[in-house]
Amino acid sequence: MSPLFSIITVTYNAEKVLERTLRSVAEQSYARIEYIVIDGASTDGTMEMVTSYKSQSPGLVRFEVISEPDKGLYDAMNKGLRVATGDYVWFLNAGDTLQSPETVARLAEVAERNGMPDI
C-alpha cells in the first residue's frame, strides 16, 4: 500500500501568508495525505481561511484542525505529532509551499521503490 503522509502546519495569526500553504497542500495529486493544522488561537482571519480550505479539500484522507492556546512553536509541533498517523511526517510552515502538485507523489514513489526507508 502507498505510504500515508502527515503534513503538519503550525500557525498563529498567519492570515496574510497561509493561503498559499493551504492551496499547495490541497492541490497535491497524491491521494494519501492527512493534513494537520495546529493553530495557537489566532485572532485574525486564520481560522476562517483554514475552515474554508477544509471544506474544499475532500481529496485528503484527513484534514485535522486544532485551534487552542499553546506554549509556543515546539508545543504546537508536538501537538501535531501526537495526532499524526502517517508513515511519514512533514512540517510545512505557514507561508511555505510544496514545489508542485506532484511533490508528495514523487516522494511516495521514491519511498516505495526503496522499501519505505526513513527520510
Where are these regions (language model features)?
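Nucleotide-sugar donor-binding/catalytic module of glycosyltransferases
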Residues: 1-119
